Design a protein with these regions (language model features):
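Phosphate/pyrophosphate-binding loop motifs in nucleotide- or prenyl diphosphate-using proteins
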Residues: 169, 231
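Short low-complexity, flexible loop/linker segments enriched in glycine and/or proline
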Residues: 28-32, 250, 323
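Feature responds to low-complexity, polar/acidic, surface-exposed segments characteristic
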Residues: 119-157, 172-188, 195-222, 234-250, ...
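Short, ordered coil/turn segments that flank beta-strands lining enzyme active or ligand-binding pockets
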Residues: 32, 47-48, 167, 175, ...
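C-terminal "post-core" interaction segments
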Residues: 1, 5-147
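A short amphipathic alpha-helical interaction element
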Residues: 161-166, 190-194, 227, 256, ...
Length: 342
C-alpha cells in the first residue's frame, strides 16, 4: 500500500521488481477462544482510484532485485556542474546524478548496466549538457549494457510506447529480439500480451478455463486461464477459445475496456456514464452494438491507438496497436509512469 501511495503522489522514485498483486483489505474478527479470523471484505484502491489487485505495482525502474540498492545509490550521487563524467537524469520529477567513477567501479558496474537497460525512450538525460540516450552513454563511458528496446520498431508510429513497455519488462519480442509490430494479433498473443503487461495472475484452485481447444501444454494456456477467470475473455458458442483467430479492433477495444473497469474506478465510471447521444454518433454506430460503450469510453479517455473516425472496427488489430493501447491504459490509470517520449 505504501508503494502504490508513493507512486500516485510522486513521493518517490520506485526501483526494483513488480510487486505481487494482492490489493485487498481484510477484517479481523476476534473469536471467543482467543483466536482470530481474517476475512477478505474489500478490494484496496489507491489515492488515484486504481487497485493493485491481481497486477501489483510496477516500479519506475524495473531492475533485478539484487541490484536495486546499488542502482538507488548510484542515482544519489552528489549534484555537480555539467561534465562528461556526470550523467544527469530526470526521473519522477527530480534530477539524479550518476558519477562515472562510481558507475564503472567493480562494485557498481553491474548496477549501472542494469540502470541503462531499465531506462525508457525519451528519458531526459545529459552528459556535459548534451542530451544523450543509453546507447550514447554506453559508448562514451566505454561500458556495456543489454538494451531491452525492440530492434524492429524504429519506424513504428508507436515505437515509444512499445519500447517504454519493453524497458519495464511488460512486453517481450521473439527469440531474435523482434516485436513484429505490423503483424496481426491473434487471440493467443492477446492474452499473453495483456497478462505480461498487467502482471495478471489467478488462484490455482480456480482451475482451467473451460475451452475445448486449449491444451494444458500450450504456451498460452496459463494466460488463457488467467484472463478467463478475470472475466476479460470469453469463448465462442462451441466452447472454443480459437487461439489462432485474429482480434479485430472492436474486440480488442472491448477487452481493453474490461481491463480498465477492473483496474481503475474512473474507467468504470466513464463506461457507466456513456449517453445515448454518444452512442448515436456516426463514428460509434459503425461498431457492433456490444462494442459501442467501450469505443466511446476508450476514445474519450485517450486510450485508442488512432482517432475513432479512422478505426475500422472489423480490421485486425496489429501488435503495435495493441501495445500502444495497453500502454495508454496503464499510463492513464497510473499503473506506469508515462515515459517522456511516449
Amino acid at each position: 500500500q505504501m508503494c502504490i501511495r508513493d507512486r500516485d503522489y510522486d513521493y518517490a522514485l520506485i526501483i526494483g521488481t513488480r510487486t505481487f498483486g494482492k490489493g485487498i483489505a481484510q477484517s479481523v474478527l476476534g473469536l471467543d477462544d482467543g483466536s482470530v479470523m481474517r476475512v477478505t471484505t474489500h478490494r484496496y484502491y489507491s489515492p488515484n482510484y486504481v487497485t493493485p489487485d491481481r497486477s501489483g505495482v510496477l516500479p519506475d525502474l524495473v531492475v533485478d532485485a539484487d541490484l536495486a540498492d546499488e542502482v538507488a545509490r548510484l542515482l544519489c550521487g552528489e549534484a555537480a556542474a555539467e561534465s562528461p563524467d556526470v550523467l544527469v537524469l530526470e526521473l519522477a520529477g527530480q534530477e539524479w546524478y550518476v558519477h562515472k567513477e562510481a558507475a564503472l567501479s567493480a562494485d557498481y558496474a553491474p548496477a549501472f548496466a542494469e540502470l541503462l537497460s531499465a531506462l525508457a525512450p525519451g528519458t531526459p538525460m545529459t552528459l556535459d549538457g548534451e542530451s544523450v540516450d543509453p546507447e550514447t552513454v554506453s559508448a562514451d563511458w566505454e561500458t556495456e549494457y543489454v538494451s531491452r528496446w525492440m530492434e524492429d520498431v524504429e519506424d513504428s508510429p508507436y515505437a515509444e510506447e512499445i519500447n517504454a513497455l519493453a524497458a519495464l519488462g511488460a512486453v517481450q519480442g521473439d527469440e531474435n529480439g523482434s516485436f513484429l509490430p505490423e503483424e496481426p494479433l491473434t487471440r493467443a498473443e492477446l492474452v499473453s500480451l495483456i497478462t505480461q503487461a498487467m502482471g495478471y495472475w489467478c488462484w490455482t484452485n480456480q482451475g482451467r478455463a473451460p475451452f475445448t481447444d486449449v491444451s494444458e501444454e500450450s504456451w498460452y494456456a496459463t494466460a488463457v486461464d488467467i484472463t478467463y477467470h478475470l472475466g476479460l475473455v470469453q469463448g465462442n458458442e462451441n466452447g472454443e477459445f480459437d487461439p489462432d483467430a485474429r482480434i479485430d479492433h472492436q474486440q480488442f477495444i472491448t477487452i481493453l475496456a474490461r481491463m480498465g473497469r477492473r483496474a481503475d474506478l474512473k474507467v468504470g465510471w466513464r463506461l457507466d456514464s456513456v449517453t445515448d447521444e454518444e452512442l448515436a454518433a456516426p463514428d460509434v454506430q459503425k461498431f457492433a452494438s456490444w462494442a459501442r460503450e467501450a469505443a466511446v469510453a476508450a476514445d474519450s479517455l485517450g486510450l485508442l491507438a488512432d482517432d475513432l473516425a479512422d478505426i475500422d472496427p472489423n480490421a485486425p488489430t496489429t501488435r503495435e496497436e495493441a501495445a500502444a493501447m495497453v500502454y495508454r491504459l496503464m499510463s492513464y490509470s497510473g499503473i506506469l509512469t508515462p515515459a517522456a517520449g511516449a
